[in-house]
Amino acid sequence: MREVPHVLGIVLAGGEGKRLYPLTADRAKPAVPFGGAYRLIDFVLSNLVNARYLRICVLTQYKSHSLDRHISQNWRLSGLAGEYITPVPAQQRLGPRWYTGSADAIYQSLNLIYDEDPDYIVVFGADHVYRMDPEQMVRFHIDSGAGATVAGIRVPRENATAFGCIDADDSGRIRSFVEKPLEPPGTPDDPDTTFVSMGNYIFTTKVLIDAIRADADDDHSDHDMGGDIVPRLVADGMAAVYDFSDNEVPGATDRDRAYWRDVGTLDAFYDAHMDLVSVHPVFNLYNKRWPIRGESENLAPAKFVNGGSAQESVVGAGSIISAASVRNSVLSSNVVVDDGAIVEGSVIMPGTRVGRGAVVRHAILDKNVVVGPGEMVGVDLEKDRERFAISAGGVVAVGKGVWI
């Protein structure tokens, strides 16, 4: 029987998420609600907890209050067994300064690693939508003998220019790691696809500590995990790529196996929601064998009255649809859609109300928005452009607490 390694999870959750504005005006990107019942951070935490990695530090910085509260209310583990998920803001142990990058966040938090003394460290991002069994990646890392392993997802070469791209040999060793190249490299077995980094890493502990310390002494570094630490280890011949398509998650369907989305823009965030709503969704939220855990509020069930209906939609607990039509949309908890209103192809966050006879199309409404009776959002983009953010793809985004 193989010895069970001691693994510490570090989740990088300090992202500001400027491209998701106005959704990040009052919260960190990992705290943005998603999918009717979750926050973005719930996906990485669910993956780690499902794999029984139960000692997790979440490094936070930007407008972290709602993120900290969400973790403390919904992610309590058994302290008696030494299990924890703890938010860790910048401690300023090394002087009065904030994190200057993801690698610097770990450098300033090295005490967490020394205290836990793990064999391996899982360093994952906090703002992607996916299912993954990290234990399989840890086993790959151990068997490969690498000091660092980068999770790579296959994308068509022509679509890879916006990502950090990985060039690996037949054994999986990374030969080069390049951010946003004009000519992305092919994979060893398919020249038409490219491995792009998912922002998920496994490190042997000493390798990470040595690399982080060396990076901290480099005045020319941006102190970024993907931009500085990984290239440093690639140059030393110590990095391998883990093919995400090899990851087998219990209960996965053929459609959502190897699903992963970077939701860093309004259009990507919107599109990922539309992946949830069909009868056979591109990403299935209802996999009981690998559950995504989210809000644990005690709410009444959703209710449909006076002929109200929802088709190809996700409707959260506590919501009421009254003589209204909801189609191809995701509604979070405590949403009210009043008589005669129409909601189509939209994402509605908790506590929002769509008034009598109002129309909302191709839009994202943040928490506690009120759309007045007869008002329209997403119908006249020129009018909307004067008062709301509109994405490159024409998605109208309305900020938190706005009355229309």
Curated annotation (Swiss-Prot):
Question: What's a single GO MF annotation on this record?
Answer: ATP binding
What's the catalysed reaction? alpha-D-glucose 1-phosphate + ATP + H(+) = ADP-alpha-D-glucose + diphosphate
User: Main EC class of this protein?
Assistant: transferase
Pathway in which this enzyme or protein is active: Glycan biosynthesis; glycogen biosynthesis; Capsule biogenesis; capsule polysaccharide biosynthesis
Which EC numbers does the record give?
Answer: 2.7.7.27
According to the record, what happens upon gene knockout? Inactivation of glgC reduces by half the extracellular (capsular) alpha-D-glucan and intracellular glycogen contents. Cells lacking this gene are not affected in their multiplication or persistence in the BALB/c mouse infection model. Combined inactivation of both glgC and treS results in a complete absence of maltose-1-phosphate (M1P) and alpha-glucan, whereas combined inactivation of both glgC and otsA results only in a complete absence of alpha-glucan.
Sites binding alpha-D-glucose 1-phosphate sit at Y99, G164, E179, K180, S197
State the superkingdom: Bacteria
Question: What keywords were assigned to this record?
Answer: ATP-binding, Capsule biogenesis/degradation, Carbohydrate metabolism, Glycogen biosynthesis, Glycogen metabolism, Nucleotide-binding, Nucleotidyltransferase, Transferase
One GO CC annotation, please?
A: cytosol
Task: Fetch the InterPro entries from UniProt.
Answer: ADP-Glc_PPase (IPR011831), ADP_Glu_pyroP_CS (IPR005836), GlgC_bac (IPR023049), GlmU/GlgC-like_hexapep (IPR056818), NTP_transferase_dom (IPR005835), Nucleotide-diphossugar_trans (IPR029044), Trimer_LpxA-like_sf (IPR011004)
Q: Which GO terms describe its biological process?
A: capsule polysaccharide biosynthetic process; glucan biosynthetic process; glycogen biosynthetic process
Which purpose does this protein serve, as stated in its record? Involved in the biosynthesis of ADP-glucose building block required in the biosynthesis of maltose-1-phosphate (M1P) and in the elongation reactions to produce linear alpha-1,4-glucans. Catalyzes the reaction between ATP and alpha-D-glucose 1-phosphate (G1P) to produce pyrophosphate and ADP-Glc.
* HAMAP family for the chain: GlgC
Extra remark:
Maltose-1-phosphate (M1P) is generated by two alternative routes: the TreS-Pep2 branch and the GlgC-GlgM branch, however it seems that TreS-Pep2 branch provides most of M1P for the GlgE pathway in M.tuberculosis.
Record-stated family: Belongs to the bacterial/plant glucose-1-phosphate adenylyltransferase family.
This chain's protein is named Glucose-1-phosphate adenylyltransferase
UniProt organism field: Mycobacterium tuberculosis (strain ATCC 25618 / H37Rv)
Protein's gene: glgC
